[in-house]
Amino acid sequence: MGGETIRDILDNGKARLNGQERLVLQPNGGEYPLRHWLMHNGYRIVGEELLHENRFYYEIIVAEPTGPVSYTEQQLYFGPLQLLARSPAFVAKWQRLLQQKQKTLASFEKARQSVPEEKVHGIAREIQWITQLLT
């Protein structure tokens, strides 16, 4: 299940959360919106793990309610604890995604129909962040 779906389930079930729970989440993509929801709902990310099996990456996020917490855009994008640990799987994942995003940006330039500038700028920003991360 993707991070957006997990976020929506958590948001719709807020009344059932008692403020004492530890959330152990495994989004298949969409980690940014899930981390964003956690931050805006007072959950601190206390554990992150990235596993690589076959050709897939699996991310596990553990969060606990702590009250207000603040993360930068890059921390939300990469994972605050992942940024600190920079495991071999983490570096490999972002090297792979950098290549994919560069191909995407190049295909935008060749597209017959114009791509919204917002989308182009978003991909370019992500490429910049990943490049900075890997250097």
Predicted segments with their positions:
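An accessory alpha-helical subdomain
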Residues: T66, S70-T135
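Ordered, amphipathic secondary-structure segments that act as subunit-interaction surfaces
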Residues: M1-D11
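C-terminal substrate-binding/active-site "lid" region of AdoMet-derived donor-dependent transferases
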Residues: L10-I61
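Short, surface-exposed, charge-dense and proline/glycine-enriched linear segments
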Residues: I9-G13, N54-Y58, Q75-S87
